[in-house]
């Protein structure tokens, strides 16, 4: 009888130990999943789809409007970021401007972004040039911000890698963009492509290409957070 009682106690102890170990493993596993499946967890990102409403931005071949492409790419990027655990603040989620004129619109975007205390600001735009042969994505940053430079370079690298763009474009400093110089938060403008190129314009209105562009930008943001120590 004593032998049976001793074995029963051993079994109960072993079962208890397994339960504790399982709970600890579950906690570690949850932390592991959050770390790797949610790479931008607890980060705050401002997405600024350029133009909107009365301001169409660039008008490309076939009357393609920049404002619509900007919003489509930004919404796709928003989805990726939120799935990755980030809090995303959009300057607009529909076809609207933030002011009655260009200056008031830009001021409103900068004020919103600055008040957000975000980790990064990503402004989405499209480019244009007199020659139809000019193509490719280019990421701009404010020349006085080292963190913005790093963010821009990482996004530029991911765009080249993921979209296979055969250009020699590199991230470039620029002091003329209003939203870049009005904030201390790391900020970049992604000029996704040239609407003046009929070839690139066709790509930029394609939903699948927009998804790939959003993914490349997302990957660049992840790389920035992974290497910034934030």
Predicted segment positions?
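Catalytic-site microenvironment of enzymes
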Residues: 1-230
